[in-house]
Structure formats: structure tokens, C-alpha cells
């Protein structure tokens, strides 16, 4: 406390006497003394033990002084405030103390002077801050949405070995999890670890906050790990909130088998599923398109006296709309009304969007009118739906007019969804610069880009081969606190593979794991497929093993990528080993898989083995044109024309239509052997099919592993025709044949 001069000491006694008197209008008595009240005198008054015994008087005097003698309050010093707060805390006036701190933080703490005074107390702040002062300041910063500042105070308490109370800790965890930063969850985890070290007794809310944080970031494995720890290590029983949080995250990811297992675990722990639990199940089934099962869950709800609510019906209607069942969706809305459940804006938005999705613009407009008639006010989502469908109809000028109309007439403020819609519209017409301009405009307006928009821009940059820009955008996303996910990294991994930058793709994979983003099967498939395509199948197998160890189940794409990788490397025996082993683990190969293997055998000149495998296939399954084409091509390369013709007849008997690849195999062989008359006949037969085949070129190319490996192979038909034309020209018969090709 500052030392006062003798006159000031006497004045201090006088003012203290006035303030501690029983007079009701004591503040008016102070007015004549205003010119004499200096900053040191004010600090001494606020710290007076006599005045501290009267907290209400102290607060009244403090507020009077702030208005009457503002010059006595230094802008960079919260010491007068701290003096008042100490007094309030000593009398357990916690709400009043917090209110004063919140007001100060809101209006006078731009430079974080309060926080700095607590973190670095000097001689003027005596005694040092107490645990109660730290607690209440931490709580005030959280109230004002500044968990990063509150975290510094918490860390100071830990260094001083002051144990924060549980409520303070849980409030800090909630603030961090809600704060939009890429470091929020890791910071929350550090707070949790400090709570454990310092001996704070944890409760179920502590764990629920962390579980929610992990789920928000898509880190389901970490959430499940926390669930296991709370029971086994900390002996804290999870509640419905714990389970429902994880169930919701699982349902969003479509992990229905895991969801069922967790539901069983929930019941084992004596918890009864509530409406939120059932709604998560309904959502999970709808997400997978299993509408029958979703409706069965609703029936189960009714049987267990848990009535479906508006949320339940909205989930079902959304599921029906996603399945294109608009009539059933509209009927379900009518059923809601009969149950006295009034459709809300979510119900209408879902149905309106569903109608637009199916091209039912008129019905969508009618629903908008019905919505207005029912007194349901259109919201931001409704407007964004309208804009989205204008964009899909490629009416960008109409979109611009619509946005202006909504802003002028309805107070509409473009949000992240609006900008995402506009960005997609620009990208749809190939205007990447326009999309990037929209992204910059978002930043200028302080609208934070969400993960979906970020991924959309990254995908466009990768497709435009602007990988450096894409990588820079990812790095800036981390720095600016954007949430990235496995799709973000998967997009860049695919982009680098497309540009033959295998090492960069692997770096992205390692970085994804470093920031603790859990890859999905799709992400693994991107990596495995890319490695196999670039001749690194053994490394792909390591990633395949990693996938299995992570608890994920490989899908058909995973197995086919490995098989194709081995075949491309000429290691057909290894491909068959993997194929046979995969079948033991529930892999069900389709025609695509079998065609890869058959083509692998043929490419390596193993025609006899290929024929044996082919015969096995036609006995066990309905093969397709590609299967026959592969075998016909092998026979033609071996100059076994009769066997090739036999297969051609066989496939036609089975109703399989020969295509350009079928005939190309024959033409190549016939031309090589100089059999022009047979070539003539085949070309005439082929010319009638040429028109339809031309339209199917892209589809056939994508389907046929035997002919889709390089640009050179894609041009085999053109080469064959060129050879035919050269030969005909040399014999003077081009005019005659050109008539047959164009007739």
C-alpha cells in the first residue's frame, strides 16, 4: 500500500469515518472531498480493514468513485478493483465479486492488465493473490469467452500448488472445448492431466466435457479411451450424457456395429436408454439408409414408453428425403400433426430441400407458402436452401439478385453456408479464382471457414494441380484454428499421388497421425490405392496391416487395390495368395476382382492358368463382357483364333454384347496375319455397333482393367483402324469400304 502524507492520513480517517457511519446518504457527504482524493488515497480507502467489514458500502463507494473521480483510476492498473474484490470474497460475496470483474474485463481490460497483475504480482499487490481471487478471476474470464486467458491463470495456480475447485476446473474445460481453436482439445487434455496431478476430485461432468471435445473433433477412439479410463482408472460411473455423446458421434460416422456394442455396454452399466439415445440410433440407421430398421427403433421407443418427439420425426423425414421418398416424408409430416406435434422450421427445411433435390421446384415453393401460412418463420437455412438450388441451376446472376433481396428485405446476413454455396457454384463452372475470392471475402467479414468449405477448396486446388497452394492453405488452416479432418488430409494425399509425388503423400499421412486425426477406411484406401498404383505394394501391405490393427474393417476397394498392385508388378502368385487369404476373412470378390486376376495371368503369358481360372469363374458366377474380352485378347495374342471365336460365340449365346475391345482383339490379329477378307466381315459387323459403342467408350475404359492402364492402350482401337485404312489404301479399296463404315 502507498505511504500517505500526514494531511492525507487525516483525510483517510475522515473519509473512513464517513463511509463506516450509519448515515444513509453518506455518498453525498463525500462530494466536497473529491478534489482531494488522489490515487494512493483511493487505494488506501478501498483496502481499509474497517471498510472491508461493510462490503455493500465498499462496492457503492467503488462505483461512486469510478464515476465521480475517474482520474484516480489508472487505466493500466486493476489494483483498486482487486482491493474491493478481496473484501467481497472475505465475506463470501462471490456473485458480486465476479460481477465487478466481468464488468472490468468487458470495458477496461483490453491489455489484460488484470491477468498480468495476477500472474506477475508486484509489491503494490499485497498480500499475494489468494486461491479464491484466482478462482473468481478465472471464472470471470471464462464468462467473457476468454478461455485462453483463463488457462494462463489456471497454470499459475498449478505452479503455486493452489488446488482450483472442481467447478472452476470443469468450467475451464467447457470453455476450452467450446473455443474455436485447433489447440482447444489438446489444452483441455492438459488441464485434465493437471487436475489429476494436483488431486482435484473428478466427477462425471469432467469426463463428459472431454468426451464431447473428442467427439467434436471426430476423435472417437480417444473418446472411447476416456470412457474406459473413467471407469477402470478413476472409478467414475458414466451417465446417459456420456454414452449419448459417443453414440451421436458414432451415428454421424455411420458406425452402426460399434453403436450397437456401446448400447449393450450402456445397459450393462445399469443405464436405461432415453429419448436422446433412441434418436441417436434412429439417426444412425437413417444415415446408412436403413429406414426399415429406423422405424423399428421408433416402435421400440413406444413400447418402452419413450414417446418420439419432434426431433425423432425430423430425423425420419430427413432419412426419407435422402432416400428420395418425398411422398412418405410428406405423409409423415401429416402424421405428426395428427399427434399434435407441430412441424417446425427444421421439418419444412428438410422437405423443401428434398423437393429441390428431386427437381420438384413447384412442390418446394408450395411448401414455402404452407410454411408461412402455418406461422413458421423462414430462417437462415431456408434462405440458403433457395440459394443452393439457384446455384445448382447455374443461375449465378439470379443468386446475386436473391442475396441482395434477402439482405435488403429480410435482414439476411450471409453466413458460412451461404459462402459455401457460392464457392461451390463458382467451382461448378470451373471458376476457381471466383471461389478463392469468396473465401477471401469470408475472411474479411470475420466468417470462419468450416471443414466442409475448406475441403471443397482444397479438392478444387488439387484438381487444378495447385498443390503448393493447397498445402499452404492447410498450414494456414492450422494456424487460424480451423478444424481439419481425415477428408482434408485424404484430399491432399490423393492430390500428391496424382502428381506422382509419393513422398509428399506419405508426409501428409504422417502429419495426419501426428495431429491425432484418426483415418477412416476411405482415407486408408486413398493411401493404399496410391501406393499400389506407384508400384509400392509391399508398403501398401504395411498400411493394410495398420488398418486392421486400428480396428477398422477393409472394404472391397482395399482388397482390390492390393490385388491390382501385385498384378501390375507382375507378382500374380502373390496376388492370388492375398486373394485366397482375404476370402478367409469374409472378403467377397466380385467380377472386378476376378477380372484383375485374370488380366494379371494373361499379361504374364500364363494363358493355361488363365483359362483354368476363367473356366472356374464361368462355373461359379455370372461373368461379364470384360471377363470374356480378357480371355479373347489372350487367345488372340497367342494366335489361337479358333479358341477366340469360340469364346465370342459363347458370350453372344449368353446375351453378353461384344464391344469395341472384343473386336479390336480380333482385328489386330487378322491384320497381322493379312486376312483382309475376314477383317472386312468383322468390320462390317462392327460398323453397325460403332455409334453406340462410341458413347460407351469412357464407361468401358473405366470398367476394363485389361485396357485402362495407359493412354497408349486406350488408343488401340484407333491404331487398329489406322492399320486397316493403310492396308486398304495400298490396295485401292478405301472408297468401297468407307461406304460400309458410314452407311
UniProtKB/Swiss-Prot annotation:
Secretion signal, residue range per the UniProt entry: none
Give the UniProt family note.
Belongs to the PPR family. P subfamily.
A Gene Ontology MF term for this entry? mRNA binding
Ordered alphabetically, the record's keywords are: Repeat
Placement of PPR repeats on the sequence: 130-164, 165-202, 203-233, 239-273, 274-308, 309-343, 344-378, 379-414, 415-449, 450-484, 485-519, 520-554, 555-589, 590-620, 624-658, 659-689
Give the domain of life: Eukaryota
Q: Which Gene3D superfamilies match?
A: Tetratricopeptide repeat domain
What organism is the protein native to? Answer: Arabidopsis thaliana (Mouse-ear cress)
Q: What is this protein called?
A: Pentatricopeptide repeat-containing protein At2g16880
Name the InterPro entries for this protein.
Answer: Pentatricopeptide_rpt, TPR-like_helical_dom_sf
Amino acid at each position: 500500500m502507498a505511504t500517505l502524507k500526514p494531511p492525507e492520513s487525516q483525510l483517510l480517517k475522515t473519509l473512513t469515518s464517513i463511509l463506516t457511519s450509519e448515515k444513509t446518504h453518506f455518498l453525498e457527504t463525500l462530494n466536497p472531498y473529491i478534489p482531494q482524493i488522489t490515487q494512493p488515497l483511493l487505494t488506501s480507502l478501498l483496502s481499509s480493514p474497517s471498510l472491508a467489514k461493510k462490503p455493500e458500502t465498499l462496492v457503492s463507494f467503488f462505483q461512486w468513485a469510478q464515476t465521480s473521480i475517474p482520474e484516480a483510476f489508472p487505466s493500466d492498473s486493476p489494483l483498486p478493483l482487486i482491493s474491493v474484490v478481496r473484501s467481497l470474497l472475505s465475506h463470501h460475496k462471490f456473485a458480486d465479486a465476479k460481477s465487478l470483474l466481468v464488468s472490468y474485463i468487458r470495458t477496461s481490460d483490453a491489455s489484460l492488465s488484470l491477468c498480468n497483475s495476477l500472474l506477475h504480482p508486484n509489491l503494490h499487490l499485497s498480500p499475494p493473490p489468494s486461491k479464491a481471487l484466482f478462482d473468481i478471476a478465472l471464472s470471470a474470464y471464462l464468462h467473457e469467452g476468454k478461455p485462453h486467458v483463463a488457462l494462463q491463470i489456471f497454470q499459475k495456480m498449478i505452479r503455486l500448488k493452489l488446488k482450483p475447485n472442481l467447478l472452476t476446473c470443469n468450467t475451464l474445460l467447457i470453455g476450452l472445448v467450446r473455443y474455436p481453436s485447433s489447440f482447444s482439445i489438446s489444452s483441455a487434455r492438459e488441464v485434465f492431466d493437471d487436475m489429476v496431478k494436483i488431486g482435484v476430485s473428478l466427477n462425471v461432468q469432467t469426463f463428459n466435457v472431454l468426451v464431447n471435445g473428442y467427439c467434436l473433433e471426430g476423435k472417437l477412439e480417444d473418446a472411447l479411451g476416456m470412457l474406459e479410463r473413467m471407469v477402470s482408472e478413476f472409478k467414475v460411473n458414466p451417465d446417459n450424457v456420456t454414452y449419448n455423446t459417443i453414440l451421436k458421434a458414432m451415428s454421424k460416422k455411420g458406425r452402426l456395429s460399434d453403436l450397437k456394442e456401446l448400447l449393450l455396454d450402456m445397459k450393462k452399466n445399469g443405464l436405461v436408454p432415453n429419448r436422446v439415445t433412441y434418436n441417436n440410433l434412429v439417426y444412425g440407421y437413417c444415415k446408412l439408409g436403413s429406414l426399415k430398421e429406423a422405424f423399428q427403433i421408433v416402435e421400440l421407443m413406444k413400447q418402452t414408453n419413450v414417446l418420439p418427439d419432434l426431433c425423432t420425426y425430423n430425423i425420419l423425414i430427413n432419412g426419407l428425403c435422402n432416400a428420395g421418398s418425398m411422398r412418405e416424408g410428406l405423409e409423415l409430416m401429416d402424421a405428426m400433426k395428427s399427434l399434435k406435434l407441430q412441424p417446425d422450421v427444421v421439418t419444412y427445411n428438410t422437405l423443401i430441400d428434398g423437393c429441390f433435390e428431386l427437381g420438384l421446384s413447384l412442390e418446394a415453393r408450395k411448401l414455402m407458402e404452407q410454411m408461412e401460412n402455418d406461422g413458421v418463420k423462414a430462417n437462415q437455412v431456408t434462405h440458403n436452401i433457395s440459394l443452393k438450388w439457384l446455384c445448382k441451376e447455374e443461375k449465378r446472376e439470379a443468386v446475386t439478385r436473391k442475396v441482395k433481396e434477402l439482405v435488403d428485405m429480410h435482414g439476411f446476413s450471409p453466413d458460412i453456408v451461404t459462402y459455401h454455396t457460392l464457392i461451390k457454384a463458382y467451382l461448378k463452372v470451373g471458376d476457381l479464382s471466383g471461389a478463392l475470392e469468396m473465401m477471401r471475402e469470408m475472411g474479411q467479414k470475420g466468417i470462419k471457414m468450416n471443414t466442409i468449405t475448406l475441403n471443397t477448396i482444397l479438392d478444387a486446388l488439387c484438381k487444378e494441380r495447385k498443390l503448393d497452394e493447397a498445402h499452404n492453405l492447410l498450414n494456414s488452416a492450422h494456424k487460424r484454428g480451423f478444424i481439419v479432418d481425415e477428408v482434408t488430409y485424404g484430399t491432399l494425399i490423393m492430390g500428391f499421388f496424382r502428381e506422382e509425388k509419393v513422398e509428399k503423400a506419405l508426409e501428409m499421412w504422417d502429419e495426419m497421425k501426428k495431429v491425432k486425426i484418426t483415418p477412416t477406411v476411405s482415407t486408408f484406401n486413398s493411401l493404399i490405392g496410391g501406393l499400389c498404383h506407384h508400384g509400392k505394394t509391399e508398403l501398401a501391405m504395411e498400411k493394410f496391416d495398420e488398418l486392421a490393427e486400428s480396428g477398422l474393417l477393409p472394404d472391397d476397394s482395399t482388397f482390390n487395390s492390393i490385388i491390382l498392385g501385385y498384378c501390375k508388378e507382375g507378382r500374380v502368385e502373390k496376388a492370388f495368395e492375398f486373394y485366397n487369404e482375404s476370402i478367409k476373412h469374409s472378403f467377397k470378390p466380385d467380377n472386378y476382382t476376378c477380372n484383375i486376376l485374370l488380366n494379371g495371368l494373361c499379361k504374364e503369358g500364363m494363358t493355361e492358368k488363365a483359362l483354368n481360372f476363367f473356366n472356374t469363374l464361368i462355373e461359379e458366377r455370372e461373368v461379364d463382357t470384360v471377363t470374356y474380352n480378357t480371355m479373347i485378347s489372350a487367345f488372340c495374342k497367342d494366335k489361337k483364333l479358333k479358341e477366340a471365336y469360340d469364346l465370342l460365340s459363347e458370350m453372344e449365346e449368353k446375351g453378353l454384347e461384344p464391344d469395341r475391345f472384343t473386336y479390336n482383339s480380333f482385328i489386330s490379329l487378322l491384320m497381322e496375319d493379312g486376312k483382309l477378307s475376314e477383317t472386312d466381315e468383322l468390320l462390317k459387323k462392327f460398323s453397325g455397333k460403332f455409334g453406340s459403342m462410341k458413347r460407351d467408350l469412357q464407361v468401358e475404359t473405366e470398367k476394363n482393367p485389361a485396357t485402362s492402364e495407359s493412354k497408349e492402350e486406350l488408343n488401340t482401337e484407333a491404331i487398329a483402324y489406322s492399320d486397316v485404312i493403310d492396308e486398304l489404301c495400298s490396295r485401292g479399296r478405301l472408297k468401297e469400304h468407307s461406304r460400309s463404315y458410314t452407311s
